């Protein structure tokens, strides 16, 4: 096919894609069933991970819950069991590659293949760069992105054999735009968004269209990891709201899940703004939270 025909085909694909998106906006999408499917959720002892586990329990999924906190993950499991779910609990440090591989092997032996994985475990240390300890930077990347690599490397082979599965990357709006005093966190979330996009492209190239991918990108979430967050333009979300949006995105095979959904439009528009305008938006937005600046805790 010559270049002109390929370009015409590209135009056709663009028009079709926009029309399809328009139709999906007005017509509710069909939701797939995840009843009976085995779902692995990391960071399930708190916040978004815990509430996501509840949502999957309501969908009658079989749950494998990971968290570094035994108390937290056991609390989540107890509620999920009350909702009628079969639950398997593992205490796992998602910054430890050897522990991840060992735990995946244990899951395969005791539970079987994982059909849906939600890489949710996260770490955040609000501080200016010079006040951030080296080990905090390392931990942020180990949990927020390297752990994703080790988990997916361990789980992907069985998904490839079946040409079936769903890989969910929990990132953040901070994976698309930056916030001061969160340099390691923003950097790790940019990496997580890149991981999702690159993995999606690779699976498509391999022809493994049965393996779905989703990436969750919420704004500030009131999980307690960032103290006293506030902002003028973006809402501070509750974990249950984010979990409901996440499960809806998974059930409709949505690639990128922004919460709230209009953030996607905001990010697209901002791409066309000069730096001076973006700085003005940041001032108006007035994002604040407790952070260590100059080795002292301040509200920034």
Swiss-Prot record:
Modified residues (N6-acetyllysine): 79
Residues that, per the record, bind NAD(+): 40-67, 189
Phosphoserine sites (modified residues): 33, 69
Signal peptide stretch: 1-19
One annotated GO biological process: lipid metabolic process
Swiss-Prot/TrEMBL catalytic activity: 17beta-estradiol + NAD(+) = estrone + NADH + H(+); all-trans-retinol + NAD(+) = all-trans-retinal + NADH + H(+); all-trans-retinal + NAD(+) + H2O = all-trans-retinoate + NADH + 2 H(+)
Residue numbers binding substrate: 172
GO molecular function: all-trans-retinol dehydrogenase (NAD+) activity; estradiol 17-beta-dehydrogenase [NAD(P)+] activity; oxidoreductase activity, acting on the CH-OH group of donors, NAD or NADP as acceptor; steroid dehydrogenase activity
Top-rank EC class of the record's enzyme: oxidoreductase
Keywords tagged on the record: Acetylation, Endoplasmic reticulum, Lipid droplet, Lipid metabolism, NADP, Oxidoreductase, Phosphoprotein, Signal
Active site as annotated: 185
CDD domains: 17beta-HSDXI-like_SDR_c
Coiled coil: none
Alphabetized SUPFAM superfamilies for the sequence: NAD(P)-binding Rossmann-fold domains
Family: Belongs to the short-chain dehydrogenases/reductases (SDR) family.
Main function: Plays a pivotal role in hepatic lipid metabolism. In vitro, it catalyzes the oxidation of a variety of lipid substrates, including 17beta-estradiol, retinol, retinal, and leukotriene B4.
Official protein name in the record: 17-beta-hydroxysteroid dehydrogenase 13
Biological source species: Rattus norvegicus (Rat)
């Amino acid at each position: 096919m010559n270049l002109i025909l390929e370009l015409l085909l590209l135009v056709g694909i663009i028009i079709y894609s926009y029309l399809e998106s328009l139709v999906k906006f007005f017509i509710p999408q069909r939701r797939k069933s995840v009843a009976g499917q085995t779902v692995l959720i990391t960071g399930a002892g708190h916040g978004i991970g815990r509430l996501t586990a509840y949502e999957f329990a309501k969908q009658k999924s079989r749950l494998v819950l990971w968290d570094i906190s035994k108390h937290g993950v056991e609390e989540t499991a107890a509620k999920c069991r009350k909702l009628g779910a079969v639950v398997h609990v593992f205490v796992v440090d998602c910054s430890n590659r050897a522990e991840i591989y060992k735990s995946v092997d244990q899951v395969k032996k005791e539970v079987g293949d994982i059909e849906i994985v939600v890489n949710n475990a996260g770490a955040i240390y609000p501080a200016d760069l010079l006040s951030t300890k080296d080990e905090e930077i390392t931990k942020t990347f180990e949990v927020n992105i390297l752990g994703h690599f080790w988990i997916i490397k361990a789980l992907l082979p069985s998904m490839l054999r079946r040409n079936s599965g769903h890989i969910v990357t929990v990132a953040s709006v901070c994976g698309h735009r930056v916030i001061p005093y969160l340099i390691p966190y923003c950097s790790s979330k940019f990496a997580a968004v890149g991981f999702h996009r690159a993995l999606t492209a690779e699976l498509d190239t391999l022809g493994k269209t049965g393996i779905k991918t989703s990436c969750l990108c919420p704004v500030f979430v009131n999980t307690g990891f960032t103290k006293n967050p506030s902002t003028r333009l973006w809402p501070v979300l509750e974990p249950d709201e984010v979990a409901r949006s996440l499960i809806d995105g998974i059930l409709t095979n949505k690639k990128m899940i922004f919460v709230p959904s209009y953030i996607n439009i905001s990010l697209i528009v901002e791409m066309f703004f000069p730096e001076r305008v973006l700085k003005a938006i940041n001032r108006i937005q007035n994002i604040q939270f407790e952070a260590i600046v100059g080795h002292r805790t301040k509200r920034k």
